[in-house]
Structures are given as structure tokens and as C-alpha cells.
């Protein structure tokens, strides 16, 4: 997680669906 306004995508390094 730790994504930014994109439905929690790979902004933290891992997809978090």
C-alpha cells in the first residue's frame, strides 16, 4: 500500500489490489 490517489497501485513498490 502507501500509494497516492491511484487506487493503491505500485507507488509503494508492490501492487496491493
From Swiss-Prot:
It comes from the Eukaryota. May act as an antimicrobial peptide. Expressed in skin granular glands. It comes from Osteopilus septentrionalis. The lineage of its organism: Eukaryota, Metazoa, Chordata, Craniata, Vertebrata. Signal peptide: none annotated. GO terms for cellular component: extracellular region. Keywords: Secreted. Disulfide bonds: none annotated. Belongs to the Frog skin active peptide (FSAP) family. Septenin subfamily. It is found in: Secreted. This is Septenin 1.
Amino acid at each position: 500500500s502507501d500509494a497516492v490517489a491511484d487506487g493503491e497501485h505500485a507507488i509503494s513498490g508492490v501492487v496491493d489490489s
